[in-house]
UniProtKB/Swiss-Prot annotation:
NCBIfam families: PRK13686.1. It is a single-pass membrane protein. The lineage of its organism: Bacteria, Bacillati, Cyanobacteriota, Cyanophyceae, Nostocales. This is Photosystem II reaction center protein Psb30. Its main location: membrane. Belongs to the Psb30/Ycf12 family.
Amino acid sequence: MFDAVSDLVNAFTSINWEVIFQLLSVALIVIAGPVVIFLLAFRNGNL
């Protein structure tokens, strides 16, 4: 029982969270560009 719990904890602690957050930040920035273009087109250039 405790081996399974410790394996689960080790799986989460071995994940490199910094890389995940950096990739998430880049993804949000990349997605934000087309969203702004779509809003500009939808509102006829009036933000």
